[in-house]
Amino acid sequence: MAQPYHIAVPDHAIQELKEKLAVSTLPDELQDAGWDMGTPLSDVKRLLQYWKDHFDWRKSEAMLNAMSNYQTDIDVEDFGTLDIHFVHQRSPITGAIPLLFCHGWPGSFLEVQKLLPLLTEPGKNGGVAFHVVAPSLPNFGFSQGVQQRGFGLRQYAETCHKLMLKLGYTQYATQGGDWGFHITRTMGLLYPESCKASHINATECFPPSLPKQPLLWLQDKLTCYTEHERAGLKMTEEHEREGSGYSMLQMTKPQTLSYALTDSPVALLAWMYEKLKDWADDYPWTDDEILTWFCIYWFSRAGPAASSRIYYESTHADASRGGIPYQRPMQWVDHVKYGVASFPKDHNVHPNTWAKTLGDIVHHSRQPHGGHFGAVEHPDAIAADLQAMFERGGNAYGCVEGCDGYEK
């Protein structure tokens, strides 16, 4: 059974962090260095000073505890029982649709916060309502870490699927971006009898291929890309060239990186803050927000660096032993209805014809603003997409058996 969970970081852990911050040694910086070289020294100094003078983790902790937090045990094949933390916000609408929200890196369950009232309460005004479940993935946040090798996409998907079943949701929808995209896509691949529809952002996909999608390939070759699509491809190429170094390191040598991220809070802060700043579309991050995101990683039950292993494990999956290859979720997944949100400043923005290689796309929105963190930057856009998909007349209406999103 699921039990209520209260986030309570020990006083000694907070004190230890303060002591580490107090003796931090900062690097120098070239004259006129900017964001193109990484997190600027001035930003790190400002955040350190704000931590010392103003930031109150207990206030952030109270904000997190205001959500409906729970924990439960999930048995994962070949990995034993894992203690999983999750937020579970039920709607008062009896026919609400069960929805799993899956975060990525450097995100957490906190990303769902702004979505909760938009998704659980709109039924009062005649809109579609959802019961929302947002876990801390294993190795992230307040869920248990994994000590064995080989915990990849199959196991993350299994964990999330079994969590939904344990909560009584035999059929459900999902929403995810970044690793949440990969994990929810894997859920659709492995559990099509349960995962009936999915909304995705921060997507990754390939152009249509002549052998697999000849008509789509021809359409892609003959159709001129829109201005939005051309800008998206340019953004994607720029990220591959100048912004993907973190990914290669975490995909190949996460253990080497872990010493810096575990020993130095400044290293973790700079490593994460660069992504928050670069991947968002001029989102006005407050210092309190940034430090709260950082602290969820620093105080993570599995340690600050455990989350980076998802990159290595997912890209080194052994298909001969049942592992899901990293690129498999970027290809066609059958039996699931998909909605896609494209944000112009995300680091992977693809043409519509490419997105159609992912599966049965029943809704695709091109947002005028926004970056990688869709649920944080523009929760209204994510909620509007879900409404459009599942409302009466929407192309995903009624696909979750017995739960159409309306009062019964």
Regions from the PLM with identified roles:
Residues 14-90, 95, 298, 302-324:
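Non-catalytic accessory segments flanking enzyme active sites
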Residues 250-408:
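C-terminal subdomain of alpha/beta-hydrolase-fold enzymes, centered on the catalytic histidine
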Residues 118-129, 167-230:
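Conserved hydrolase catalytic core segment
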Residues 105-117:
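The serine-hydrolase catalytic nucleophile loop
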Residues 93, 133, 137-179, 205:
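Active-site loop/oxyanion-hole signature of alpha/beta-hydrolase fold enzymes
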Residues 96-104:
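Short beta-strand element of the alpha/beta-hydrolase
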Residues 59, 110, 125-128, 137-151, ...:
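Glycine-rich "HGGG/HGxG" loop immediately N-terminal to the catalytic nucleophile
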Residues 1-2, 6-15, 20-21, 25, ...:
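Alpha/beta-hydrolase
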